[in-house]
């Protein structure tokens, strides 16, 4: 026959599985708590990311017209919109951002003219035409902060009383927003 163990020995052996069961429950609770913490962190990060607006920089652009001619200043550049980022100062378009610019120049003149488009005083012009009555040009130029784009129109005719232009416009559009800008 088999020998039966006394009750005291059974109690001693039974406590060990109960301790391992408590240890297993503790480990499972810790894992659940960490999972809950990770879920809570993910939800908080998700909602905080929704509150941050992803704003792209406004594209630098301007459309100016030149229709009025003054003997001292040449053609006067005027912008039709007040809310444009780029501005006209001292008859020049001020460049605020480094990068490539798409430049369009159009106009029909009443006389033969010499036209040049400059960006710095002592540099070669971006664009130059001699003895023309109209211009319709499109170009890309690399401009930097503090450059000033201005138009120089001259004529050999001494009578400037009837000197005018039809449809004179200059358009500049920055092609790579996000470059160095000072606004």
UniProtKB/Swiss-Prot annotation:
Subcellular location(s): the record lists: Membrane
Which residue ranges are assigned to the Extracellular compartment in the record's topology?
51-183
Superkingdom as given in the UniProt entry? Eukaryota
THD domain segment(s): 51-173
Q: Which GO terms describe its cellular component?
A: cell surface; extracellular space; plasma membrane
Membrane topology summary: Single-pass type II membrane protein
Q: Name which cysteines form disulfide bonds.
A: 97-181
SUPFAM superfamilies registered for this protein in UniProt: TNF-like
One biological process term in Gene Ontology: positive regulation of interleukin-6 production
| Signal peptide residue numbers | none
Q: For this protein, what is any one GO molecular function term? A: signaling receptor binding
Classify the main location: membrane
Task: Check the record and name the InterPro entries matching this protein.
Answer: TNF_CS, TNF_dom, TNFSF4, Tumour_necrosis_fac-like_dom
What does the record give as the function of this protein? Cytokine that binds to TNFRSF4. Co-stimulates T-cell proliferation and cytokine production.
Q: Which family does it belong to?
A: Belongs to the tumor necrosis factor family.
Q: What is this protein called?
A: Tumor necrosis factor ligand superfamily member 4
Gene this protein is translated from: TNFSF4
